[in-house]
Amino acid sequence: MTKHFQHSRRDLRERAFQALFAMEMGGDFLPASQFAYDYDKEAADDKQPSELPVFLLNLVNGVMDHKAELDEVIKKNLKTSWSIERLTVVDKTMLRLGLFEMTLFEETPDRVALNEIIEIAKKYSDDTSAKFINGLLSQFVSDESAAVTE
C-alpha cells in the first residue's frame, strides 16, 4: 500500500528535495515544485494544481537563492580528497537543503532540520550517504540548539 502525502513538514521537505533534484536535472522551478507537491497527493485526482505551501516555496527558493554560498560552505567542509563535483546529485541536493534550513532558515531548530534531512536521506540514498550527510551537517548544529534539547 502506498503512503499518501500528508502535508506535514517532513513531507514538504521531501517535496522540496524532489523539486530541487528535478531542477538540478534541468527542470524549471514552478513546474518541478508543483509536480513534487501534487504527485502522490490524493487531491491530485481533480486535475487542478494545488496551491503550493509557503514552507515548501521558502525551502526551494531559499536553496536556489543561496546555492553558490551553500556550495562554498559544503566545499570548505569536505575532506581534502573530496570535491563537490564528486558528490552524487542526491547527496549534494540533500546537503544544500539541510544546510540552508540549519543556517539560513530560522523557523526550524538545527537539530530538527538535521534529523529531518537524515531521514529523507535514508529514503532516497543509502546508509553510507546518510552517515556522510549527518557527519557533515552535524558541524552546523548551534550550541543554542544543543542547550534546548539537553
Swiss-Prot record:
Q: Which GO terms describe its cellular component?
A: cytosol
Which residues, by range, are in coiled-coil regions? none
User: What biological process terms from GO does the record include?
Assistant: DNA-templated transcription termination; transcription antitermination
- Keywords tagged on the record: RNA-binding, Transcription, Transcription antitermination, Transcription regulation
- Claim: Transcription regulation is one of the keywords in the record: yes
Q: Has the keyword Transcription regulation been applied to this entry? A: yes
Pfam families per record: NusB (PF01029)
Q: Which GO terms describe its molecular function?
A: RNA binding
Its biological purpose: Involved in transcription antitermination. Required for transcription of ribosomal RNA (rRNA) genes. Binds specifically to the boxA antiterminator sequence of the ribosomal RNA (rrn) operons.
Q: Which family does it belong to?
A: Belongs to the NusB family.
Under NCBIfam families, the record lists: nusB (TIGR01951), PRK00202.1-1 (NF001223)
Q: What is this protein called?
A: Transcription antitermination protein NusB
Taxonomic lineage of the native organism: Bacteria, Bacillati, Bacillota, Bacilli, Lactobacillales
Corresponding gene?
nusB
